[in-house]
């Protein structure tokens, strides 16, 4: 896993301190949420979203702030997203490529999110289960590879979708050592 993440993230990932193996990506997402949020914190969730995201936020004691993605391209409104960040969330959940709508966020969209995450000191929890299921002309960009984002990104994924082994429940987190250690 560390070799894979190192290759795709363009940085050396330490398998002993920056990878956490989980029982599927659902556990990875919940562990990430519980690591960086406390009861009463707020978490931004793009909508529509995979059914667990809102529940994960609520179960961790956080309050979800829903930001709509508008069809047909499922783009977000930059002003609405910044308004959500102005509520000082502790984290944002980013599913890229998105489940259920299939949106692949562009580099410029990710950079906009990254700039807000840095400005408002917000963690970004990514669900990148569909990272290798992307069709041209789209291109998946790992959020953690954006300038300044490694330190505040918890990248969650699994082997289920790409390798068609959903029953094996093999998930993982790739995160900076201080965060991975808490998980």
Can you name each region flagged by the protein language model?
Residues 2-42:
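Phosphate-binding glycine-rich loop
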Residues 15, 34-94, 107:
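PLP-dependent aminotransferase-like
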């Amino acid at each position: 896993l560390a070799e894979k993440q190192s290759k795709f993230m363009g940085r050396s990932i330490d398998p002993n301190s920056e990878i956490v193996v989980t029982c599927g990506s659902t556990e990875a997402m919940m562990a990430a949420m519980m690591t960086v949020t406390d009861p009463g914190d707020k978490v931004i969730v793009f909508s529509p979203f995979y059914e667990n995201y809102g529940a994960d936020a609520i179960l961790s004691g956080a309050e979800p702030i829903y930001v709509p993605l508008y069809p047909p391209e499922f783009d977000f409104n930059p002003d609405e997203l910044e308004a959500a960040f102005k509520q000082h969330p502790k984290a944002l959940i980013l599913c890229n490529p998105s489940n259920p709508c299939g949106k692949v966020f562009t580099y410029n969209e990710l950079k906009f999110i990254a700039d807000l995450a840095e400005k408002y000191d917000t963690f970004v929890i990514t669900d990148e289960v569909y990272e290798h299921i992307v069709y041209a002309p789209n291109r998946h960009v790992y959020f953690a590879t954006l300038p300044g984002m490694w330190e505040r990104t918890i990248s969650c994924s699994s082997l289920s979708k790409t390798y068609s082994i959903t029953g094996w429940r093999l998930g993982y987190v790739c995160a900076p050592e201080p965060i991975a250690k808490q998980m």
